[in-house]
Amino acid sequence: MRKVLAILLALAMLAAGVVSAAAESTESKATLLCLNIGKADCLLLSYENTHWLIDAGYEQNWGALKTALSQYDVDRLDGVFLTHCHKDHYGGLMLLAQSGIPVDAWYASSVWFDVKEGQHPAVLAAASRGEEVSWLSAGDVIPVGSGASFTVLGPLEVNEENENNNSLVLFFSSPAGSILLCGDMKIEEEMDLVDAGSLTACTLLKTGHHGDNKTLSDSFLAKVRPEAAVISTSTAEEPDTPAPSTLRKLKDIGCAVYETQECRDALLITLSGGKVTGADDIIWDGVPARIEGVTLEIDCEADTVTLRNTSGAPVSLDGYTLLSTKGTKSLRLSGLTLEPGGQWVIGGRKTTVTVDQTWDEKNVWSNKKRDVGILYDPWGRPVCCADNGLD
């Protein structure tokens, strides 16, 4: 069955116009805008006046996505792809649907688990507009135009142990170059694609699962041989990413590596003539720089979070949002200004110590598993984070 699928995928990619580097034109250009929104994923692929969104980050990142679309004059999306059902990928979908920005097509993998179809985040977003989701399977091709297309490589089968391994894997091919988009794919799904013969070399690789140590097997890298790779992550939020082993493997094959956390607002990667011709650190026009000097401290036993201003100037946190990633509970701050050296303590409904503000939740912070608190500014950008000290 997998041999048959490999043949079908090869035919699909030929029909889609996959061409050699020697035949690629230097006239066309493809760009991948990778937002620096912490560990969450949100990518905007643009080619010949078409625009395609791959994932939408957390709900709290909507301000960043909205800003990106505005700054690049994107008033219509040709397609929105949800790679899989995790909140750091689908969180912004509903706000996008409610924004009024036209979306020509909503796409998601036909394979997932542990979510009823009626509650699937892509279904909910599309249905809020009276629209439907196009379910994708390996071998499907989405034409882009001007010699470009997306080919669906995976998933090949449902994985009921880890939703990351149900990630929609897309191969974008164009005269400008090719991009392999992996969602949060880990080694298990990588090996499915290797065994099926689904993979081919790419110009740019968007690594799976934030570049952790359960991605990029040697056999996978030998097939895709990227010129460059981009990793969407935040070491502050997820200390094990990117893994040293991941960075070493990419370096060993001569692959240039870009990390979203190393840019300011976004990273714009440009492909032309079958090569990566640019990787620009983007700063939003007319948007203030991220604040500095504010820290978080979580006490999961007391169920409190303390915000401190360690800078020498007052800091306004009006309109900022706090997120607890374990339960994805959020709290919007209003009218709060921290003086130099000042602090603000927020507790849940069951907190017994003295606090400055009550978060209307019984238990905000997990006292059993690792929970990360993130403070987002009004433009959807994380400005600081801290965990609860648990594994």
Q: Language-model segments: what does each one mean?
A:
Residues 1-9:
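Positively charged n-region of N-terminal signal peptides that target proteins for export
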Residues 23-76, 135-201, 266-293:
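Core dinuclear metal-dependent hydrolase active-site scaffold
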Residues 34, 44-46, 51-55, 78-82, ...:
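Structural recognition of the beta-strand scaffold that forms the well-ordered cores
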Residues 48-52, 59-108, 195-212, 225-230:
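Active-site metal-binding motif and surrounding structural segment of the metallo-beta-lactamase
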Residues 63-68, 215, 326-333:
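N-terminal post-signal-peptidase region of extra-cytosolic proteins
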Residues 92, 105-113, 190-266:
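Cap/insert and terminal regions of metallo-dependent hydrolase folds
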Residues 286-391:
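Activation on beta-sandwich/Ig-like modules and their edge loops
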